[in-house]
């Protein structure tokens, strides 16, 4: 069912001796919404620009179906881009901007007019055709940029952090809008962002990138709940890392792990474990339970910060050994013990089975943040 | 982006630009440097052997006096431009935005008008029986006409008149960038008007002052037609000397050496300007 | 006082700047021969000007020189600005520096160096030498004007055009040139005016075969008063004013 549309293999690129992409392989399926997620300098923009044809890989190939695009100039690729700051032609009207790509294809005038009008109607800008870009709001410019790219009916639409210039509320609206467009058009979207929330809420699949290497490729849920490594776990969402030590491996596909002196039974992870081995126990803030200090379960600590977030109450708890724990609880107004004061002693626990285990990694030396290429 | 189809275009542009600058800027300047260390020759302008005679001649009291006088007039011109221009630029930056555009426009209109013609217009005013003298006499302020034309003052007035916009424009641009917050912050921290001026306004506008000096001082030594029209034979600029040596006296080595003097002055001013910009954290050009 | 002092001061300085120009214009209509007294309204100096064949010839020569110098320097200057903006190449800083030095150097230094060059290579002083010289001193101004426009230019625009199917040439024609057009026009007008106004450089590199207006004016005003100059100056003033308004209008319109 899932058919590969765009196939990237062994892509390698260096800028001034620095590896931006390192033998990267990625298959993009037909009709999916895939997001390239990572911090600045991770190579996501370079990767996107390579698909568009603005950068050339030092090594590797880009293929669309069975057509090799590696050396095809951008104007001959059936892919179109929505640029970060829209890149609308300032000297052309909205209509002429959208018509530009069709004029390049030398389409008949009548057809151009109809298709441009359709595209503008699709982004609800049919009344703005004669305006110049600078007479539009940021959100409207964004819509024009999208209309201009999709009017050519590309096989793949490349979106380079298209929402980063919009304010929070507008960004949410545009996220929904983009999802709707993608469903209606059935075009494959490749979306670049450094905003993990955006990536999780919009995508069918997320590619987490760091230093030109794919850290993880999976559905938003997989990436969030089962991060492949510490980087992904840290980058996507907030996470508590508890130090654990394997006590013993049980016969029934479970292991017993010592966490803060508590013996907990976890499902056996998919990496090999042996007794005495250290590992990380990952728990999302929403998986943490804050209990009364006289509860028999849990680790003792005290509340050092309480942040009211509307639907949730976020706390920071200092355990006795100094570990900092983030907890995010949904309101339960019927629970009288729910609210704790600052400095109040509490116990911290979680439901077994919600944890995620990762092996310890040799800590990489802290590296200078590169520029986003 | 750097596709192969662009390479010939890129190469052609670079060759054209480099060619133009090498042939019409670098080579000619090297020729001048070369000429300045050669011997004067009535037939072919210059000839061997190499000599530093031209530079020695610069120190000849006769010429030294002319140069110092020229430097004095240029310095006076610059000072007058600065004294008029600094408050002017300040006041201009305080005017409402709409009027500012118009006022800037009015400032550059004279700059776009032929400078010879404008110098000549000054002559109409300053001449012995010109408008100023006639006006003052009919008002009874003076009894007989003053000698205004063909004086040092006339040359300075002419130079100021031609060069004032070049002082004002860079000053205006630094005053435009001078944010009101700085002044408020300074007042807020207890500085009075005078100490705010000395400690905040002056350092921040210094690059503009130096740019203005650079744009006024050097031309004020080179615009030879101003003394020709207003100054008579006793108020010459370095420019007049160079022109005479090249076109009349045919002493190329000496003219070349004099022009190198001007170039060195330029280099010095550019260096000072860079330094002042770096001090307030802007990149020098 | 706080409001009136700066305004009075501004007005005073503008007055000083404009008095000579007003005097010039008024006296261009003066019937008097001596030049200092008012002798009634007349167009005689304009008539004299237009009947002076050498003067009219010099005017045409100047106009043609300014047109060609502005055009050539805009072409080369625009290409230079594009190269500086788009390409990375060795010696870019040197190139930038050289342009800056040309702009800042006293005109007379440029003038004698070009004279030396032209004599060395045996170029007949005339139209060609004037053109080469004028293009050289106009060049940095054009480069700066175009560079300023390019620095505000979104790097993604050419890419967007390519992305939508334009090849390099089409992109240049449909996007790059239209976007930098105002700067090209402004640069051209600046070059035109600089060329038309130049005395210093032209004094050195022109020959008897090609007399231009500033030099003709120069020889007229060096001694005594020539009322025709008033008329000529007024004409030049009107001409530059039209050009200036045109250029400002273009720049303002493009900013919208």
Swiss-Prot record, chain A:
Q: Name one GO molecular function term.
A: ATP binding
Entry's EC annotation: 7.6.2.11
**Residues annotated as binding ATP:** 38-45
Keywords of the record, alphabetical order, are:
ATP-binding, Cell inner membrane, Cell membrane, Membrane, Nucleotide-binding, Translocase, Transport
The record's similarity note reads: Belongs to the ABC transporter superfamily. Spermidine/putrescine importer (TC 3.A.1.11.1) family.
Which NCBIfam families does the record cross-reference, listed alphabetically? potA, PRK09452.1
Q: What does this protein do?
A: Part of the ABC transporter complex PotABCD involved in spermidine/putrescine import. Responsible for energy coupling to the transport system.
Query: What's the subunit arrangement here?
Result: The complex is composed of two ATP-binding proteins (PotA), two transmembrane proteins (PotB and PotC) and a solute-binding protein (PotD).
The name under which this protein is listed is Spermidine/putrescine import ATP-binding protein PotA
Species name:
Marinobacter nauticus (strain ATCC 700491 / DSM 11845 / VT8)
Q: Which gene encodes it?
A: potA
């Amino acid at each position: 069912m899932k058919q590969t549309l765009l196939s990237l293999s062994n892509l390698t690129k260096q800028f001034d001796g620095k590896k931006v992409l390192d033998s990267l392989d990625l298959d993009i399926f037909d009709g999916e919404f895939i997001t390239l997620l990572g911090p600045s300098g991770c190579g996501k923009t370079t990767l996107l620009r390579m698909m568009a044809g603005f950068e050339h890989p030092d090594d590797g190939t880009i293929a669309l179906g069975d057509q090799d695009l590696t050396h095809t100039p951008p104007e001959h690729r059936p892919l179109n881009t929505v640029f970060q700051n829209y890149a609308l032609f300032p000297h052309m009207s909205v209509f002429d901007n959208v018509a530009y790509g069709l004029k390049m294809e030398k389409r008949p005038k009548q057809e151009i007019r109809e298709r441009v009008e359709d595209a503008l109607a699709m982004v609800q800008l049919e009344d703005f055709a004669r305006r110049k870009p600078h007479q539009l709001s940021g959100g409207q410019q964004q819509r024009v940029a999208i209309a201009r790219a999709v009017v050519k009916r590309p096989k793949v639409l490349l979106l380079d952090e298209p929402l980063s210039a919009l304010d929070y509320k507008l960004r949410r609206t545009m996220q929904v809008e983009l999802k709707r467009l993608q469903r209606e058009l059935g075009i494959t979207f490749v979306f670049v962002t450094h905003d993990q929330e955006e990536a999780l809420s919009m995508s069918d699949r997320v590619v987490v990138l760091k230093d030109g290497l794919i850290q993880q490729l999976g559905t938003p849920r997989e990436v969030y709940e089962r991060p492949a490594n510490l980087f992904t776990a840290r980058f996507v969402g907030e996470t508590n890392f508890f130090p654990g030590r394997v006590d013993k491996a049980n016969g029934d596909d479970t292991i017993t792990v010592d966490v803060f002196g508590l013996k907990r039974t976890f499902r056996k992870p998919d990496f090999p474990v042996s007794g005495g081995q250290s590992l990380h126990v990952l728990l999302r803030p929403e998986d943490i339970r804050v209990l009364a200090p006289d509860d028999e379960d849990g680790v003792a600590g005290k509340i050092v910060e309480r942040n009211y977030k509307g639907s949730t109450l976020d706390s920071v708890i200092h355990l006795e050994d100094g570990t900092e724990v983030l907890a995010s609880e949904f309101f339960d107004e019927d629970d009288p013990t729910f609210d704790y004061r600052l400095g109040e002693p509490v116990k911290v626990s979680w439901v077994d089975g919600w944890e995620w285990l990762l092996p310890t990694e040799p800590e990489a030396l802290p590296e200078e943040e590169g520029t986003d290429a | 982006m750097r596709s192969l189809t662009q390479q010939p275009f890129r190469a052609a542009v670079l060759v054209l630009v480099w060619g133009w600058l090498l042939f019409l800027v670098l080579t000619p300047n090297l020729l001048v440097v070369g000429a300045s260390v050669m011997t004067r020759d009535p037939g072919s302008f210059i000839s061997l052997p190499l000599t530093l005679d031209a530079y020695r001649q610069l120190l000849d009291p006769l010429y030294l006096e002319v140069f110092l006088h020229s430097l004095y007039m240029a310095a006076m011109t610059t000072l007058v431009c600065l004294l008029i221009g600094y408050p002017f630029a300040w006041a201009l930056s305080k005017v409402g935005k709409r009027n500012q555009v118009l006022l800037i426009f009015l400032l550059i209109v004279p700059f776009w008008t032929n400078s010879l013609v404008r110098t000549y217009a000054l002559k109409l005013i300053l001449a012995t029986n010109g408008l100023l003298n006639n006006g003052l006499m009919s008002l009874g302020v003076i009894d007989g006409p003053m000698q205004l034309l063909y004086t040092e003052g006339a040359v300075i007035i002419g130079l100021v008149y031609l060069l004032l916009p070049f002082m004002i424009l860079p000053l205006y641009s630094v005053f435009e960038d001078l944010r009101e917050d700085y002044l408020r912050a300074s007042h807020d921290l207890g500085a009075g008007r005078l100490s705010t001026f000395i400690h905040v306004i002056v350092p921040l506008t210094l690059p503009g002052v130096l740019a203005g000096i650079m744009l006024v001082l050097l031309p004020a030594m080179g615009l030879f037609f101003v003394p020709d029209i207003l100054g008579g034979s006793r108020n010459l600029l370095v420019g007049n000397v160079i022109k005479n040596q090249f076109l009349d006296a045919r002493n190329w080595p000496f003219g070349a050496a004099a022009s190198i003097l001007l170039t060195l002055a330029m280099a010095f001013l550019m260096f000072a300007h860079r330094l002042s910009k770096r001090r307030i954290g802007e990149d020098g050009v | 006082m706080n409001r009136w002092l700066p305004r009075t001061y501004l007005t005073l300085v503008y007055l000083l700047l404009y008095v000579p120009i007003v005097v010039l214009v008024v006296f261009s209509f003066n019937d008097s021969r001596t030049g200092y007294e008012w002798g009634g309204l007349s167009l005689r100096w304009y008539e004299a000007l237009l009947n002076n064949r050498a003067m009219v010839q010099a005017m045409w020569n100047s106009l043609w020189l300014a047109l060609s110098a502005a055009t050539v320097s805009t072409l080369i200057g625009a290409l230079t600005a594009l190269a500086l903006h788009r390409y990375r190449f060795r010696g870019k800083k040197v190139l930038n520096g050289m342009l800056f030095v040309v702009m800042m150097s006293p005109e007379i230094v440029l003038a004698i160096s070009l004279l030396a060059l032209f004599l060395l290579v045996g170029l007949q002083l005339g139209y060609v030498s004037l053109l080469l010289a004028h293009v050289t001193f106009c060049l940095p101004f054009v480069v700066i004007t175009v560079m300023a426009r390019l620095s505000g230019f979104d790097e993604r625009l050419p890419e967007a055009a390519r992305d939508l199917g334009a090849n390099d040439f089409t992109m240049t024609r449909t996007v790059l040139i239209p976007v930098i057009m105002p700067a090209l026009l402004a640069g051209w007008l600046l070059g035109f005016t600089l060329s038309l106004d130049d005395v210093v450089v032209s004094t050195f590199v022109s020959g008897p075969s090609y007399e231009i207006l500033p030099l003709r004016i120069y020889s007229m005003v060096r001694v005594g008063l020539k009322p025709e100059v008033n008329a000529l100056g007024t004409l030049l003033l009107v001409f530059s004013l039209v050009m200036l308004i045109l250029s400002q209008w273009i720049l303002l319109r493009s900013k919208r």
